[in-house]
Regions:
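Structural preference for beta-rich elements and adjacent junctions enriched in aromatics
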Residues: 1-229
Length: 229
């Protein structure tokens, strides 16, 4: 597989990982706090894989609206780049630059390159209309809503959810917890994974969040009112 990691601001604070395997499998993640990977993020990008007798190659298209970024200076943008190739049979990893996510400093060690400033906008509406039919009572129940995403440029993204369908994402892993503290569950809902890294902060050797978005939309512990976030 190959990994393409990009720090769009070049400041070592937030990076984005794009992974493509030889079997056309993909993965992506947000990188914060030097080496913390949040795989709940699903970015908008494209890829293609080609294989022949000489080997295999991959092509990746990452639109400029994929991630938020600061305004460029003097028409030039500084990017942080990290590229590597992993051979599964031997576990060998060839990387440029020489950096490792196992070290204390990883994201800030990306290679800095200068590219011209580009502007690319995005406006997307994802509607939904699920239905439910009760065979016992003979009743039907329908809902409707939409996710709206507007990015006129890299500095101003607007995300909205109208009657969000929180059942459209993958189910959580089953965890049996007999302790007093609740089990931490990451958020996979698209509305909350967009720019989620802005709520992360480092406290000693722990990664914490200012807002626990999984409680949004849920009831409080006593069943009265909304849950604390």
């Amino acid at each position: 597989r190959v990994n393409v990691m990009v720090d769009f601001n070049g400041d070592g604070r937030t990076g984005y990982d794009f992974v493509v395997s030889s079997t056309n499998g993909i993965n992506d993640a947000v990188i914060t706090n030097e080496s913390r990977f949040n795989k709940d993020w699903d970015g908008s990008w494209q890829h293609a894989v080609s294989e022949d007798a000489a080997g295999w190659s991959v092509e990746i298209l990452i639109p400029w609206y994929t991630a938020p970024m600061h305004a460029a200076k003097d028409g030039q943008r500084t990017l942080g780049i990290y590229l590597d190739r992993v051979t599964g049979s031997s576990g060998e990893r060839d990387a440029w630059p020489v950096a490792s996510f196992m070290r204390p400093r990883f994201l800030s060690e990306f290679q800095r390159i200068e590219v011209p400033q580009y502007h690319q906008s995005l406006f997307a509406i994802t509607p939904y209309a699920p239905g439910l039919y009760d065979n016992v009572r003979g009743r039907s129940h329908f809902q409707h809503g939409a996710d709206i995403l507007w990015k006129p440029n890299g500095q101003f993204p607007l995300t909205a959810a109208l009657n969000a369908d929180f059942g459209q994402v993958e189910s959580d892993d089953l965890v049996v917890n007999f302790g007093a503290p609740e089990t931490y569950v990451s958020d996979k809902r698209p509305f909350f994974t967009e720019n989620q890294g802005i709520f992360d902060f480092s406290l000693l050797d722990d990664n914490s969040q200012l807002v626990y978005t999984r409680r949004v939309g849920g009831p409080s512990d006593d069943g009265h009112g909304a849950a604390d976030i």
